[in-house]
Amino acid sequence: MTIETEAADDEPKKIEINNILVPIDGSEYSLKAAQYATRVARNEKAQLFCIHIVTPRMPYGYATPAASFTESRYYEDIKHKVELWFDNVRNMAKDEGIPDIKTEIFIDVKSVIESILDYASHKNIDLIVIGTRGRTGLKRFFMGSVANGVLQHAHCPVLVVR
């Protein structure tokens, strides 16, 4: 895969892809994005980073007085679910001949968009691969707000997968 940009002298300049980021939320779209990301990582011999962002809030079901769940249990449940998603991506990567991927779960007070962009900048990500929509039920949008925000503000190319 070759990504070219216009240099100052209008000559195409090839961008090296060494680090690829794929944000995962467990949706069908994020898993399709992970499939694309693993293929690109294989072709480019790039490191694949897979992250999930958790905003620090508890859903209504966890906050009822009768519920035995504590905040720490809430985060344990999320971690367990996300690790299953990561395992799925690890298996995809192994099928593509990629022995290891970097996975991280973040609890961040910033927006999911800001967290993804900060991570991409901090890890020197060369390409972000993201699904068109996440887990929200708002299907009226043509493209999810997170994907759109990342696409609009990322410092690097973004591949949006549907």
Where in the sequence are the language-model features?
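Gly/Ser-rich helix-loop-strand patches that form or flank binding pockets
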Residues: 1-8, 119-162
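Aromatic/hydrophobic pocket-lining residues that form π-stacking "cages" and hydrophobic walls in ligand
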Residues: 37, 89, 116, 150
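Small/aliphatic-rich secondary-structure junction motif
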Residues: 11-70, 94-96
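A short acidic, glycine-rich active-site loop
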Residues: 69-84
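General small-molecule cofactor/ligand-binding pocket signal
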Residues: 51, 102-106, 159
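Short glycine/serine/threonine/alanine-rich loop segments
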Residues: 46-47, 99, 125, 156
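Structural beta-alpha unit
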Residues: 1-15, 91-128
